[in-house]
């Protein structure tokens, strides 16, 4: 008869308990399709897409994508904004929630139009989805993003305001932001972000929808809410994020001359934690999703992910404050024209990136970078071994 090793038994039971506690995460079955959740005694749905290379050992981001008013996730995904390919390429969880009926209008919507009574709690519906997915999958809780089209874009701003403890950044296409002062009659508190928040907006100057007019709408029109202009939106978020007052402005190459529109890119840099506010102003653009309808010079899907993925709830990922730059390293001239030189670096890998995180060139040791063919704009130089970076400007 053998004796039990109690130390071994304790370790075994501890390990068994640990695995049981986390089994729903470690052994979650990847399921792509509609899932249900009961929220406020109402059965709600969302379309979930988990990339094939998901691993429970590697926490990954979540991107919510919200359909417009009167829409549904499947039609929206198939005909307006299909980001499943991006989710596969960049390894993030993609979620298309489904809105419910506004009791005051009978239409499918994210924003309650009622002027009295308690508004629907759609913000907590999204919070409940985040909690459910985080229970079943390994999620990077600092990298949860939201985007949407039309009313879905408006709702993305609402999440940036009212679920900011969970949301790192948002992007809105053809959807304005509600004025917090005018929202008071719906029972909401003022917009109250808690951390530097990355914001992208893609508005059309010729959009005729009342809730997404470039110049704002409709104070004095006897409507329930006031929708901010594009300039008011960027002013609010650049002030909150403490970015540069003057944006970097450039014209996007007009690759499609038949779509009747062009794009101007405006980027407000150097916000708290390195966050940015970016506007892709579609000049001549209507109530569209660029790359699918209307303007074809950009793909809004790619623009949104390239922008949001640079940030987490702490700001720009791997951002360094200028006070931490190594004083022995000198980059000159800056601003530069046809070249710049890096001094004070030995046997270090030096990488040059553009404003959108694309690697332009890499070198080792002190060296001269020939920049004759680079476009004017902002670039970032990263010295790997010293873990420092410089912002450079080509004039």
Which residue stretches match the model-derived regions?
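The feature captures the conserved acid-bearing segment of alpha/beta-hydrolase catalytic domains
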Residues: 168-169, 174-248, 254-261, 267-273
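The conserved beta1-alpha1 loop
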Residues: 64-68, 174, 203-204, 283
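Alpha/beta-hydrolase-fold serine-hydrolase catalytic core, especially in secreted/extracellular enzymes
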Residues: 197, 238-322
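A domain-start/cap signature at the N-terminus of enzymes
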Residues: 26-62, 75, 89, 118, ...
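Serine-hydrolase catalytic machinery in alpha/beta-hydrolase-like enzymes
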Residues: 37-53, 57-145, 149, 158, ...
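Acidic beta-to-alpha connecting loop that harbors the catalytic carboxylate
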Residues: 99, 205-208, 284-286
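Bacterial Sec-dependent N-terminal signal peptides
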Residues: 1-30, 319-320, 380-381
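C-terminal outer-membrane/trafficking sorting elements
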Residues: 323-395
């Amino acid at each position: 008869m053998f004796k039990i090793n109690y130390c071994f038994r304790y370790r075994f039971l501890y390990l068994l308990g640990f695995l049981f506690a986390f089994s729903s995460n470690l052994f979650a079955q990847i399921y792509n399709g509609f899932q249900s959740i009961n929220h406020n005694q109402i059965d709600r749905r969302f379309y979930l897409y988990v990339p094939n290379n998901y691993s429970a050992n590697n926490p990954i981001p979540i991107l919510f994508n919200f359909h417009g008013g009167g829409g549904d996730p499947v039609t929206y995904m198939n005909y307006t904004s299909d980001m499943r390919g991006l989710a596969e390429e960049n390894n993030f969880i993609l979620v298309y929630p489904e809105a419910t009926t506004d009791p005051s209008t009978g239409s499918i919507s994210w924003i309650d139009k009622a002027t009295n009574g308690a508004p629907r709690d759609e913000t907590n519906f999204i919070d409940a989805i985040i909690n459910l997915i985080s229970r079943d999958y390994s999620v990077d809780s600092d990298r949860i993003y939201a985007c949407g089209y039309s009313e879905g874009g408006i709702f993305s701003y609402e999440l940036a305001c009212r679920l900011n403890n969970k949301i790192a950044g948002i992007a809105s296409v053809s959807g304005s932001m509600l004025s917090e002062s005018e929202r008071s009659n719906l029972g909401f508190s003022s917009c109250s972000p808690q951390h530097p928040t990355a914001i992208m907006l893609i508005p059309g100057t010729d959009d005729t929808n009342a809730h997404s007019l470039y110049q704002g709408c409709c104070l004095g029109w006897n409507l329930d809410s006031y929708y901010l202009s594009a300039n008011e939106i960027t002013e609010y978020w650049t002030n909150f994020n403490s970015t540069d007052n003057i944006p970097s402005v450039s014209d996007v190459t007009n690759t499609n001359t038949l779509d009747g529109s062009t794009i101007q890119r405006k980027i407000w840099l150097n916000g708290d934690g390195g966050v940015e506010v970016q506007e892709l102003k579609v000049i001549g653009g209507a109530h569209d999703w660029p790359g699918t309808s209307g303007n074809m010079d950009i793909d809004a899907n790619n623009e949104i992910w390239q922008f949001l993925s640079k940030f987490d709830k702490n700001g720009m990922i791997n951002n360094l404050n200028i006070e931490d730059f190594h004083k022995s390293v000198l980059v000159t001239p800056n601003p530069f024209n046809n070249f710049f030189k890096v001094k004070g670096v030995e046997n270090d890998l030096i990488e040059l990136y553009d404003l959108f995180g694309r690697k332009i060139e890499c070198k080792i040791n002190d060296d001269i970078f020939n920049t004759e063919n680079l476009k004017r704009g902002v670039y970032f130089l990263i010295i790997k071994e010293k873990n420092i970076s410089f912002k450079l400007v080509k004039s």
